[in-house]
Amino acid sequence: MRVSADTMGPFFTVAASAPAVIAFISVQKEEHMSDQVAAPLDAAAASDAAFARISSQPFPQDIFAAPQLRWAVIGCGVIANQMAQVMALAGRPLAGVANRTIEKARAFAERYGVERVYESYDELYADPSIDAVYITTPHNTHITYLRQALAAGKHVLCEKSITLNSAELDEARALAHEHGVVLMDATTILHMPLYQELVRRMNTGEFGQMNLAQVNFGSFKEYGDLTNRFYNPKLAGGAMLDIGVYALSIARLFMASQPKELVSLANRSTTGVDQTSGFVTRNAEGQLGVFSLSLHSKQPKRAMISFDNCYIEATDYPRADHATIVWTNDGRREEVRAGEEGYALAYEIADLEAAVAGDADKLKLLDYAADVMETMTRLRYEWGVYYPEEAELAAAAGVEAAGA
């Protein structure tokens, strides 16, 4: 749908949490919204293609190095199916599944050879044979399952975005510490071997000083009614939690510290969630990040990380297994490959198991996730995007929570 100037609301200056932070928002007033639910995710089709490429190959023996844990999954959606596929391919089928609808859980278990279907979530948590839980439900439900699973002494791998806001993540981290278990964010970027290799090389000083990250992510999702999760505030819709987490995560991996200063513009949909945004970040070391996100405008998924001696370009970066380094002195292009897109979810399982075994580098991944969550939370609040679960915070800020 095209938006003309007279359908745009005014711009507002939003008070910032620090003097250097400025934010503006405009509220987009659509005449109507289509009743068509969003088309299937491009990412899902890409993942299917990646899985097809690996399904006839022997599973790599070097992915899983730590002692094996017994896993159960909460939820039976697209990402849960992808995880079940790759684990079955690895010869490590999931040990259990729980879902709000028991019939879906039974069908899921039959499809992937899952050992046990739980009649309730409490039954799963009480099963001493389950070591770790993978949470795949909508963003706004994560904190409930995190509280329950962590308190039950289960290690947890939780899909992105791991929580609604930084306060919830702080609570979950405290629970994990209290109960002596590992909590891990399942944002794929944190686990892909490609980025681990590039960060390793960066840390040797080979690339020189990191100066700037430029990251785009734009999808085209049809406007729909509130059953469309992308625009539904009651399902924590909006671009930031759905795709912004990828953009911020890849930049954070290469930056010395999290951003302190933010300057941003955002448009909200009529449902009140963030639809399109552009923002610039700067950390204490002076490293800049320039980002653009959209749920209603297609953009290439492209990340460019610039250093003194080179820049790195990664396309389709959420599960990338290759990138290009362009060297400043002679323009030489170096192709770097590591890992395989189709094994993205296996790397997540492997990283949690390694963290449980005491791998300090894997344990540190949650620190990156916490930095990203803090930035996402600050930006959303500066744009006036609060979810129903954040109604009290919205009232204190003098705005109404989306979907309230």
PLM features: residue spans?
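Predominantly a Rossmann-like dinucleotide-binding segment in NAD(P)-dependent oxidoreductases
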Residues: 189-262
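N-terminal Rossmann-like dinucleotide-binding module
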Residues: 34-112
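Beta-loop-alpha module in the N-terminal Rossmann-like domain of NAD(P)-dependent dehydrogenases
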Residues: 83, 101, 112-173
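Rossmann-fold dehydrogenase core element
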Residues: 171-188
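Short, Lys/Arg-enriched N-terminal segments with co-localized hydrophobic residues
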Residues: 20-32
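Hydrophobic residues in well-ordered beta-strands that form the structural core
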Residues: 158, 183-185, 314
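C-terminal helix-rich "cap/oligomerization" subdomain common to oxidoreductases
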Residues: 34-65, 132-134, 351-404
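NAD(P)-dinucleotide binding in Rossmann-like oxidoreductases
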Residues: 268-274, 284-353, 361-367
